[in-house]
Amino acid sequence: MGGWRVLGQASGGWRRGLGIRATSTAAGFGTKARHQLQRRGASKPSDPPGDQPFPGLLRPGTFSREELVDVLRAAVVDSKGPLVTLNKPQGLPVTGKPGELTLLSVLPELSRSLGLGEQEVQVVRASGKEASGLVLLSSCSQTASRLQKFFTHSRRARKPTATYCAVTDGIPVTSEGKIQAALKLEHIDGVNLVVPVQSPSRKDIMEGVKRTLSHFRVVATGSGCALVQLQPLTVFPSQLQAHMALQLCPVLGDHTYSARVGTVLGQRFLLPVESTKPQRQVLDEALLGRLCLTASQAARLPLHLHLHCLRLPGARPRDPPIELLAPLPSYFSRTLQCLGLHYQ
């Protein structure tokens, strides 16, 4: 496959008991946050109760600043010293243009709501806009700096610190390995898209092409889909979505890069990037049936990519690492149930 390839048997570091078996109680942030809004009389629920194909899915773009602060306060999963950990809802951007409602834009209000007073709170690590999962905040600049140095050192040493859970449409050929690809950002039709580059030259690297690397491990398979753990070893926008599309197994709910995977007579192949525009992910009838979704509902399917675990250094050099965990969103758990995907 030219500039990208899968290498068998990734190095260790996988968390073996993630507690991600799909159960009706794995609500993540959804239930508490929704009840918080309902008590405030919010008039913007996602769908009528009982008719929700994506339970627990919030739409941050419809919230007022006050409502978003309520949701984020209810999404706190851990607070210790200067560190606060949130379980970010899918669809909430961390940064954005001036005037846009983002995590950064409400940090002052959130800080006061959490009792941190006027201390400046920094985002140390966060899942991307379309992904759900962990956000690590710090009210201490020295702690934030120490953690940033730890993450940078870990990347250089090829030691994973973040583990994502993903449901993929398709099953990787190997059960465990590495995905390597040279990627670049390209402005196409007014949108910044990640584009793979085969055999990049030194000039390409100088002009912004980056060699990227991710580990993956297949946890379970069923109904032509897979539950996959992903560990990025480099930092690049939409890296995990682009990597899984290159493996012909796009992430469920990826309405940007899944269009690059074509199918003829049951065989999947990569379509030319230059002639493939982002579009709503198309799922076959059998998969729609297993998910109990109509085609129009599938067009609103959220990205099933969740930052589940962050690995942090201990307080002292000889202390064991600390693991922060964020429960899966309810809609993610529902998908696992529908597809019969369970952690073994």
Swiss-Prot record:
CDD domains, A to Z: PseudoU_synth_RluA_like (cd02869)
UniProt keyword list: Isomerase, Mitochondrion, mRNA processing, Phosphoprotein, Transit peptide
Subcellular location: Mitochondrion matrix
Phosphoprotein as UniProt keyword: yes
GO cellular component, one term: mitochondrial matrix
Residue numbers bearing the Phosphoserine modification: S64
Organism this protein belongs to: Bos taurus (Bovine)
Compositionally biased region (Basic residues): 32-42
Region (Disordered): 29-59
Protein name: Mitochondrial mRNA pseudouridine synthase RPUSD3
GO BP, sorted A to Z: mRNA processing; positive regulation of mitochondrial translation; pseudouridine synthesis
Interval spanned by the transit peptide: 1-41
Assembly information from the UniProt record: Forms a regulatory protein-RNA complex, consisting of RCC1L, NGRN, RPUSD3, RPUSD4, TRUB2, FASTKD2 and 16S mt-rRNA.
Catalytic reaction list: a uridine in mRNA = a pseudouridine in mRNA
Domain of life of the source: Eukaryota
Taxonomy of the source species: Eukaryota, Metazoa, Chordata, Craniata, Vertebrata
EC number: 5.4.99.-
Function per UniProt: Catalyzes uridine to pseudouridine isomerization (pseudouridylation) of specific mitochondrial mRNAs (mt-mRNAs), a post-transcriptional modification necessary for their translation. Acts at position 390 in COXI mt-mRNA and at position 697-699 in mitochondrial COXIII mt-mRNA. As a component of a functional protein-RNA module, consisting of RCC1L, NGRN, RPUSD3, RPUSD4, TRUB2, FASTKD2 and 16S mitochondrial ribosomal RNA (16S mt-rRNA), controls 16S mt-rRNA abundance and may play a role in mitochondrial ribosome biogenesis.
Any one GO molecular-function label of the UniProt entry: pseudouridine synthase activity
Record keyword ATP-binding present: no
Family: Belongs to the pseudouridine synthase RluA family.
